[in-house]
Structure formats: C-alpha cells, structure tokens
Amino acid sequence: MFDSFIDNNKDEIINQVCELIKIPSVSNESANSSHPFGEECTNVLNYILTLGESMGFRTKNIDNYCGYIEFGEGEDLVGIIGHLDVVPALENDGWTTPPFVPQVRDGKLFGRGSIDDKGPVIASLFAMKAVMDSCSISKRVRLIIGLNEEKDWKCINYYKDHEEWPSIGFSPDANFPAIFAEKGILSLELKHNFSIKNYEILDINTNNNAINVVPKYASITLKKLDNNDFDLKNNYSNISITTLENNTFKIESFGTAAHAAHPELGENAINLLVEFLLDNFEFENSFLKDIYDNGLFDILSPKFLAENPLEDESGVLTSNVAILEYKNNILVIKINLRVPVTISLDDIQNKYSCLLPDLKVNRLSSQEPIYIEKDSFLVKTLVDIFNKKSGFNSSPIAIGGGTYARAFENFISYGVTMPGKKDMCHQVDEFVEIDDLILASKIYAEAIYKLSK
C-alpha cells in the first residue's frame, strides 16, 4: 500500500538526509538559553520542522529543546522518537571524506548521522507521509525529535515535562527485527592518587572523547626529573613516542573507535597506553597495577565483579574505559558500563567502590534497563512486519545500546540496522546502505499503520 510512494520519493529521501548531515549538530550543553544545545542543534530542528510543515504535517518547536511532527486525529497518541544530534567527528580522525559533507558511493550514504539517527528520522517522516496520504487512521501519530540523545537526554526530559506522552511506539535508532531488551547503562568516575617515579606528568589527554565511544586516541606527556637516559620498550605497533624539548616527551596510543555498547568492535587506546606504561615505568603507588590486575580494563565482565561472567538473556556486561584526566596528582578514569537487565546498577557501583582502599567512585549518570516480553503485542507486531517486508525470519534481540525507547512505557527500538550488518554508529566513515534505508521506510509505514488504525 505504501511502497510505491516511498520508491517514488527515494531520491528525495536521500536528499533530505544529506541536508541534515550538512548541519554539524553536535549537542553543546554549555550553550545559551535561546539555544540550549547550541545553534547547530536549533538549526537542524528548525530545518526538519519546516520540512514537515511543507509536507502537510502539524509541527511544534518546544523551546529549541526538541520538537514534533504530527498527523491524524483521535484521543490516542502513537509515538516515534528519534534524534538529530550527533557525536563529534573530525576530518583528522581518519574519515575518507569530511564527516559533514555527505557523499553517496557504492550504494551507501556516508556522513556523520547517516545511520545515527538522521537517516532513520527521515525514513520515519516519509513513512508517515505515505500513511497520511494513503489511508485513514483512528489515532494521532507523532514524530518526536530530540537534540541531546548522545549526552544527557535533557531534550526528552524537557518534552516529558511539557507535552503529552505517547502510549505506544518505537525508536528508529538500533537494529531490526526489534529490540525487546536494552541493558542498563552506568557511567562512573574513579579518582585516585597517581604519579610516576622520576617523572613529572605534564598532561594526560584522550582528545575530548565521549563516554559512550571507545577511545581511538590517548596520550601522556612526561618530563624526566633526573639526568639518566630513558630506555623505553616499544613493542607496540600503535604506540608512538615523540621527544620534545626540556627533557620532555609524549607517548601516544592509537586505537579504533566504536560504540561503547560494542567495545569488542573497537580497540581501546587507553587500554593500550596503560599496558605500555606498566611495561616501562615504576610508580609511586600500586594503583595502576592493582586495577589492571583486577581486570578494570577488561571489556567483557571485568573479573573483579564476579568469578563467572555477569550475563543473562540480554547479554554479557560490557565495560568501556572512555576518558582519562589528570590534575593535582589525581588520575580520573571515566567508565561506561552496559549492565544485563537482571543485575542491579547499585550492586555494580558498590563493587567498584570496594575495589581498592582510597578509591573514590562517583556516579556520573545511569539509565535503568528496559524489558518487554517477546510475545507482547508490540514486539510480535513489529517483528512480524519486519519479517514479512524483508524476507527474513528473525527473532527479537537484546542490545547494550541506550535508545529513546527507555523514555516511555510500551516502546521498543526498531531498526534501521539489518540483521548481520555491521553497526556503523559513532564510527569513522559512518554510513547507511541506501537500499536498507528505503526498506526501513517501507517497514515503518506498515508499522505506523498497524499501530494507529
């Protein structure tokens, strides 16, 4: 019923995703009250609201925190929740082409936000248009657009304080066929005294890495305090040592970025740097060696947490050591954990607090897990639609990622990454396969119709 409309608008769908990618909408929480997440986030919101209005929808800008695009009549409200903020991207991170200059090649659309989440938002918008122009429904359908998803969710919290809550829906910000469970998310800050014998630590840098990204870069700059020559064992292909003036030098570590929900897909530059330091230096205390030996840098269920891996049907606990900071002889380590749905976030934090004496542990943020029965109406309906439209025979899955599906009851994440495809969220050369995006739009149209008729 809806496929022909989406096929006929394929070029326009891709064009509109490109227009969104051109806006470097990295959320900036230090912005002013007129632009709570920065001018670029305001610009991208106004762009899509103007687009929605031109397509015949009702729209609303909610104080530049978020907005929505809506059609239909009725008391009940079906929701689709996406976001237009993106994680940072720099050309010197290794992008083949500039991250905010969209490019189509080999059937893929490249650019920051192409799959997370600008492409899926546009796919959802055109799915709404296909339904609106083709049939009548008995409920309202609202596409809610956030601007702070990659950080603290202040946008969706603002929405919840000021606007009507949908009673059912999905977020196009993960994987097909559908997500029945999302792990809990726990971000911790660890602090402890740290110094290296015979060296002054001038700087430790992780290049402003986001806590939900596996760090691709880490460095430490040292000044030697005696006149002895330094002899460092560098058996690491991804470690670089640069001699500077005045008896100083910089050690740099180079890894591979990935989403913190899948740390196994990346190579953590902090972990590499720590291993190098332990191989080459002596320390004023045993802190770094102790946390390393206890498994703090393990990416799968750090061994100090339990004798056996912590896991359930939602998967195994994962850990991403994301950020290092250093000031006044204090080393700060920021960690992002994805915790199986049956395990208490408080219990995990307590185990970190008990890891070592004098270790200070603070909770930076947390999100409780979500779990919806696989045989619920919502999960079964969306999985059936996906399998029918795609030709797959897939079952619902659990993920470590955190999506807006957590914002409301009776919501799940739904696409756009297809089964068996690599998750390109937060990665260098992020892309979405064009055929997959068009198929996702067709799937969303059918889902909107089934949930709102």
Q: Which role fits each region the language model picked out?
A:
Residues 138-146, 204, 289, 363:
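Beta-strand segments within the central parallel beta-sheet cores of soluble alpha/beta enzyme folds
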Residues 48, 261-328, 338-347, 359-453:
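An extended, acidic, His-containing surface patch that forms the Zn2+-binding/catalytic region
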Residues 58-62, 241-244, 321, 397:
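Short beta-strand
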Residues 2-110, 134-137:
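Acidic/His- and Gly-rich active-site-bordering loop/insert found
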Residues 150, 156-340:
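Midchain, well-structured core segments that form catalytic/ion-binding scaffolds
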